[in-house]
Amino acid sequence: MSVFSKIFNAFKSIRLNDKNVVVGQQLDYLLVSSMYAEQQSAYLNSYETGLSKATIKKLLEEYWSVFDKETAIEILLDLQNRNEDKYINFVYDAFENKSNYVTILKSNLPAEEEIFRGYLDIYRNLNNVVPELIEENVIEDFAQIKRIKDAAWNYGRGAFLSRCCYEAGYLSESEMKEYLRKSFTNLKKYCSTWQEYTISYIFGRALWGGPNNSGMIQIADDLLHNEKSPLKNKKYL
């Protein structure tokens, strides 16, 4: 996809399928994929993404290293398991107690240098990400992030990838639906509203992808407020 096409697609909002529409509780499960789906200009209201086979193949292989059922399951499970990180709260505690952050991190994180440096990088990223999100009016304070974490970033990407894997033939329809259901159920442990879902996704994107997230913020606004959006009249997960 050319740079021009990506820019053009960024301004195309809310793509809906007029066939094979998902409704009811199943739609709620499906909408966990909505942030990533909007990034890719995919359908929001059907299991079918509306993307070409070539686009799906490129997304799976070049960006996610998914080539078959085995690698698909490996990546999808990893995205769900990332939310079970038992050390991340210590990083958040260190961020809230900056004068004592070294002691907090060294006392609670694994001693292995590579692992420790990984968490230290997260701590440093927080110092850039949190002020930016407050300035952009995405969050009011860090307390919002500490509760919802980047759960939607992980579950949301996994949910959309499961749809792509289904279309690529790596997951059965029942496997995809179960993955979407589980993603929704687990997401509710962190986010209680769809607005929190979008905030959590933006936070994850900012934490791992860097600054300049105005595009993601616009996507979230469209999902929550555009009259065509399936999320427009939904508040709670």
List the model feature ranges, each with a label.
Residues 2-166, 170-237:
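Polar/charged low-complexity regulatory segments
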